[in-house]
A protein has these predicted regions:
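Function-determining surface determinants
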Residues: 1-301
Length: 301
């Protein structure tokens, strides 16, 4: 904790503390009001958990083992709720196919309605399980401990030099995950890259005060890339549901080609976005961030 006689924390420390408090508040909100739908609660919780995990990775050198333990706990809770997302992901994949031009020409209106109904039933059941009373209690306990930890951690020691260094570490990490050959990238490789993009997108919120307009564009482009890769992954989930003995097996022949064509379009768009976002070498990225942090600190001082 910083006392009144202590010097004001670095701009990076103040930004980090505010960001962590915002994440904790956003994670508590979906499990408190009784009138929020399970689908909306799962969506908001998954987002908060992703933000929390991304920043915990960033500050692990400062906080130590506790950050890693809390990150693993959040990851495990997110995985437990993953099944609650599959039905919704497949529904979004069907909508994506419908938005891609000539909708689903090989499927009758009746077939589309049955598919949507089955997926909705899957999603509703999984969401109810995903947010059981016991899991809500565990989530509430986790966020309470997180709130206490944020006030206890020595965040005032985090300075702009560390911010630039740590953001660069994970920028390098996402660059290393870029597929070498996009045309032959496996769903697993694209999913790993998407995970790194999500991590980077949320970590870059720390840099927002440096140049808000630029960072807004950067985060927006990262979100667009994430959305493209996410849509590709939704189609992977839909494809799995058409395999033998799965809920949509009877429509496999009609959906298979449509899924493949749409995935190709998403990969092409993701490749273009990646070329813009991650063209800069990590050394240049760090130098630019360091200069922006220094300029922002001097302007305040």
């Amino acid at each position: 904790m910083v006392h009144k006689d202590d010097p004001s924390p670095d701009i990076a420390a103040r930004t980090l503390a505010a960001l962590l408090r915002d994440i904790v508040a956003s994670g508590r909100k979906p499990i408190e009001p009784p009138d929020i739908s399970d689908a909306a609660a799962v969506h908001d919780l998954r987002k908060a958990l992703k933000r929390w995990r991304a920043i915990l990775r960033l500050i692990a050198p400062l906080v130590g083992d506790e950050a890693e333990l809390m990150r693993v706990e959040a990851r495990n809770l997110a995985r437990e709720m993953a099944a609650a997302r599959d039905g919704q992901a497949a529904l979004e994949a069907i909508a994506d196919l419908s938005d891609a031009g000539d909708s689903l020409p090989k499927l009758s209106a009746r077939s589309r309605a049955v598919i949507a109904e089955r997926l909705a039933e899957m999603g509703a059941g999984a969401q109810a399980i995903g947010l059981s009373p016991a899991r809500r209690t565990r989530l509430g306990d986790m966020w309470s401990r997180a709130a206490a930890a944020v006030e206890r951690w020595p965040l005032e020691r985090f300075d702009r030099s560390q911010a630039a260094e740590q953001l660069t570490v994970f920028y390098r990490r996402v660059c290393a995950a870029v597929p070498d050959d996009w045309s032959h990238a496996s769903p697993e490789a694209l999913h790993r890259f998407r995970q790194r993009v999500v991590e980077h997108r949320y970590q870059m919120e720390l840099a927002d005060p440096l140049w808000p307009k630029l960072m807004h564009v950067w985060v927006s482009e990262a979100q667009r890339l994430r959305d493209r890769l996410g849509a590709h992954h939704d189609l992977v989930i839909l494809q799995r549901l058409t395999e033998p003995h799965q809920p949509l097996a009877r429509w496999r022949s009609q959906l298979e080609l449509l899924i493949a064509e749409r995935q190709t379009a998403h990969v092409a768009a993701a490749k273009r976005l990646t070329g813009r976002l991650f063209a800069e070498k990590s050394k240049a990225f760090r130098q630019r961030l360091a200069s922006l942090w220094e300029h922002r600190a001097q302007r305040r001082d």
